[in-house]
């Protein structure tokens, strides 16, 4: 499960919305769609390790504790 509020706040802080984050993920080799991303944000499916790694890289989440707080709730 993901802490959606924490992830969304980090997205806003870094200047991303769902569409732009998905586009950047695709540019970095993690192929996903906005619908798939939305399903993961609503808990219908889960982010995998590749997703989490790329999202953390894009959003400049470097601290392991912060990564865990977002993706290991």
Task: Show the residue positions of the predicted features.
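Short, basic-rich loop-to-helix N-cap that marks the start of a DNA-contacting helix
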Residues: 43-57
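Key DNA-contacting residues within the recognition helix of helix-turn-helix
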Residues: 22, 38, 67-68
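Recognition helix of helix-turn-helix/homeodomain-like DNA-binding domains
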Residues: 27-46
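A short, basic/aromatic helix-end/turn motif that makes direct DNA contacts
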Residues: 24-27, 59-61
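A short, Lys/Arg-rich alpha-helix, primarily the initiator
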Residues: 1-18, 22-24
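Helix-turn-helix DNA-binding elements, focusing on the entry/boundary residues of the two helices
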Residues: 18, 34, 52
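Short C-terminal boundary/hinge segments that cap the last helix of small helical domains
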Residues: 49, 59-73
């Amino acid at each position: 499960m993901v802490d959606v509020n924490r992830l969304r706040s980090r997205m806003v802080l870094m200047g991303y919305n769902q569409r732009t984050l998905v586009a950047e993920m695709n540019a970095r080799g993690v192929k996903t769609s906005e619908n798939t991303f939305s399903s993961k944000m609503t808990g219908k499916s889960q982010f995998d390790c590749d997703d989490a790694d790329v999202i953390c890289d894009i959003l400049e989440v470097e601290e392991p504790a912060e990564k865990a707080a977002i993706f290991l709730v």
